[in-house]
Design a protein with these regions (language model features):
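Glycine-rich beta->alpha junctions and the first turn(s) of the following alpha-helix
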Residues: 89, 110-211
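A short, Trp-centered hydrophobic/proline-enriched beta-strand micro-motif
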Residues: 34-43
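A short core secondary-structure module
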Residues: 64, 68-112
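Short Gly/Pro-enriched turn/cap motifs at secondary-structure boundaries
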Residues: 46-49, 73-76, 90-92, 118-125
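A structural signal for short hydrophobic beta-strand segments in well-ordered beta-sheet cores
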Residues: 56-59
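Internal helix-loop-helix
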Residues: 1-35, 75-82, 94, 223-226
Length: 229
């Protein structure tokens, strides 16, 4: 849970580092360095992570944008100080009409909805985030208007290995516990680890674990080379 929260905070500020202005990087990077928390607001109740169907709207009004919409399943949603929000600025363009914005938690119109009662990762805060007539300065646009989808794809390519590493650690721990239990649990005078059926299960777990680890290391090497596809 803690790993998810830390990763999500990095995830939230990454678009600024990838495509933000120097002013944005200095202002919001400094706030995170001081201990503030960020969150990435992509997922929506009706469209999930399909950015082409994003219903959250950002309408230009002078030197501001007016933001309306609801995001769901947002990691750090209830505790973040800074949100990066994906919103449609040109609905007729689908995913090509998405833009990213920096939104401060204390901006009027920003509220936190329900917190998810999750089966696992319960120490990681996950909530709805609601934007109702939220006015944000045009200077909070990350990159160019309608370039949010492209920025998000770069973001996901760089951050997915982090999630994979976390899942790999959980899987390794599960295998370690399974092996330990199989060696201790005795049936008919022998540890169940000596039973062929159990050996098969443990071997399959190890194969899948090593395959995932090899994939993660390969992805990390590609990123080190500047290859993100």
């Amino acid at each position: 849970g803690f790993a998810s929260s830390f990763a999500a905070s990095t995830f939230g500020i990454k678009p600024v580092l990838l495509a933000g202005t120097e002013e944005q990087k200095k202002a919001y990077g400094a706030r995170l360095a001081e201990g503030q928390i960020s969150a990435m607001c992509l997922t929506e109740p009706q469209s999930g992570s399909d950015m082409g169907n994003t219903k959250c709207r950002a309408v230009k009004d002078g030197d501001e944008y007016v933001l309306n919409g609801t995001k769901c399943f947002i990691t750090n949603g209830g505790i973040a100080d800074i949100y990066t929000v994906a919103a449609s600025t040109s609905p007729e363009l689908g995913s090509a009409g998405i833009s990213l914005f920096i939104v401060d938690r204390n901006t009027p119109g920003v509220s936190v909805g329900k917190e998810e009662d999750k089966l696992g990762i319960r120490t990681s805060n996950t909530t709805d985030v609601i934007f109702q007539d939220v006015r944000i300065p045009a200077t909070n646009l990350i990159g160019e208007e309608n370039k949010g989808f492209a920025i998000s794809q770069k973001l996901l390519a760089r951050t997915r290995p982090t999630g994979m590493a976390s899942a790999l650690g959980v899987a390794q721990r599960a295998l370690d516990l399974a092996v330990d239990y199989a060696q201790q649990r005795v049936t008919f005078g022998k540890p169940i680890a000596s039973r062929q059926a159990i050996k098969f299960k443990l071997a399959d777990m190890e194969i899948r674990l090593q395959t995932a680890r090899a994939q993660l290391f390969y992805n990390a090497q590609q990123i080190d080379k500047g290859i993100y596809d």
